[in-house]
Amino acid sequence: MQKGNIGVTTENIFPIIKKFLYSDHEIFLRELVSNAVDATQKLKTLASKGEFKGEMGDLTVKVSLNADTITISDRGIGLTAEEIEKYINQIAFSGANDFLDKYKDDANAIIGHFGLGFYSAFMVAKKVEIITKSYREDAQAVKWTCDGSPEFTIEDVEKADRGSDIILYIDDDCKEFLEEARISALLTKYCRFLPIPVAFGKKKEWKDGKQVETNEDNIINETYPLWTRKPVELKDEDYKKFYQELYPMADEPLFWIHLNVDYPFNLTGILYFPKIKSNIELQRNKIQLYCNQVYVTDSVEGIVPDFLTLLHGVIDSPDIPLNVSRSYLQSDSNVKKISTYISKKVSDRLQAIFKNNRKEFEEKWDDLKIFINYGMLTQEDFYEKANKFALLKDTDGKYYTYEEYQSLIKDNQTDKDGNLIYLYSNNMDEQYSYIDAAKNRGYNILLMDGQLDVAMISMLEQKFEKSRFTRVDSDVIDRLIAKEEHKEANLESNQREILSSVFRSQLPQIKKVEFNVETQSLGENGAPIMITQSEYMRRMKEMANIQAGMSFYGEMPNMYNLVLNADHKLVKQVLTDAGNSCKAALEPIESEMANLNNRRKELQKAQEGKKTEDIPQAEKDELNDIEKKISDETTKKQAVLGEYANGNKIIHQLIDLALLQNNMLKGEALTNFVKRSIELI
């Protein structure tokens, strides 16, 4: 028996490794099983070159458990005592030291912690044994033992077969790794696509009402996964079946891309376009990154463009540096090339489907839309490609490219200033009457009800020359697309004031909602009353909900316009009735206000051109007094009109109809509206 010290400076490397990688203990199994697979593949390579002429036999890597140990066994090339000294005592542990020194401050950011190799065994084991025999003729089998301290022993032993057994004596605080279900889950996670068969226990079958073991090895992996095969060998059903294996609970994918490139980098894989639900965040982390068929991570930010993290599938590349921090990836030339390549393949695939099967593309657009829009918003080079096949959908369910839609609306939806107006709705049911009014004018209305449509609208307004997007309920129909200068309602200022006051006085108090009452000339057949909301303010508030740094707009009240149609007979009736009913009460108030206004004008004219200090104090006091009296008389006038309006059912009914149309009539107010409607009938 030989004893010795491992050439490391650390007194006891085992607790340091354990503490350093506390959250990733499970990767020891990936490292040791992939090492066993490597040893087996090396033997196959030697045999193919004629450097190994012995029998190959069963090359299955086996993982087994007993009460205290986990054993990983292979029939690969094995090790001699000299090779153990070189590869285990020197290289492996010096590699451990280097790794710890370099990454101790950023442990959890290391991509997959790949390259930990053999020494990861000490993350879970208090003692590790290697029993190994080289493939070379007449090689002596040896046993190496270490408890994680710098001391080890190595001795000759008997071993009938070539290869290695790695025996881990599991530490007391890692007993979970002695549970069959835990190891089975880890092997499925990390090793399900390794290129050499990996066996864990025996297959089980139901017999006499219970599961019993058979004599057949339980192979946990597919050694020839779909992405390693040539696309010409595969059918659509193969891709769909593989997708269901990866994501058993997912809907069938829309389509897929098979990646296969070996220059200037190595990359294989299959990326699927899923049916993307409304919540983008729930879609992330579904791409699995492999390195030579060994699972690394499902967190691929930095390796693929952000919008492509919405895809599902597998990418496999030995050229992505895995023992580095994620921030390093962004500057790695190979990673940049891979990211650009994947993005180009995605856009090329979408372009091809659009070009070759427009009907299929349109059928899948509603599921693809959020993905393509996300890419266009975040990647300028993707936008340059995607704007040729990205679609706009109108409220009739028809689809148009950007260019097609511009041609469709340019004659009828260009305003007096030469701006092309894109009308849109984000809720066809709630905005039905506005849509109907716009269609009656011959306008086309887009449906923009997606999660990213607010951001898309803002971007497209910047991309499209002399173009503006306007929601169909943001103004009265005559002003949505202004063809000529707007004509004000033919009313005297006093009549406007009466209408404004009687309707304003009966508007409900709604939290964080404010109304501006205005009078327009909308024609006898136009609606008597409607509620609109400024496109700018509403959009700013919508952006505040999805974009950081815009909370100011989110805190502001919702501003609405209550628009009265001065041409409608009901509004005319209210105006006439208010004037007649309030005449006696208003005459003295209006007379007094007229006198006060005249005197105010006289004083203001007398003070024109004078410096403040040159105006007599008596005049200043009189002007202030007049302003207060005018305010008091205005309050009296509004009180008279408010009292009248309070008893006018037509005013209440019109306001409630407008609120109801905009989904703003709820609770007691809705109940009162129903009762009043029955009474009026």
Where are these regions (language model features)?
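GHKL/Bergerat-fold ATPase module in large chromosome/replication-associated machines
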Residues: 110, 128-151, 171-175, 181-681
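GHKL (Bergerat-fold) ATPase N-terminal catalytic module, capturing the glycine-rich phosphate-binding loop
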Residues: 1-172, 176-177, 185, 587-591, ...
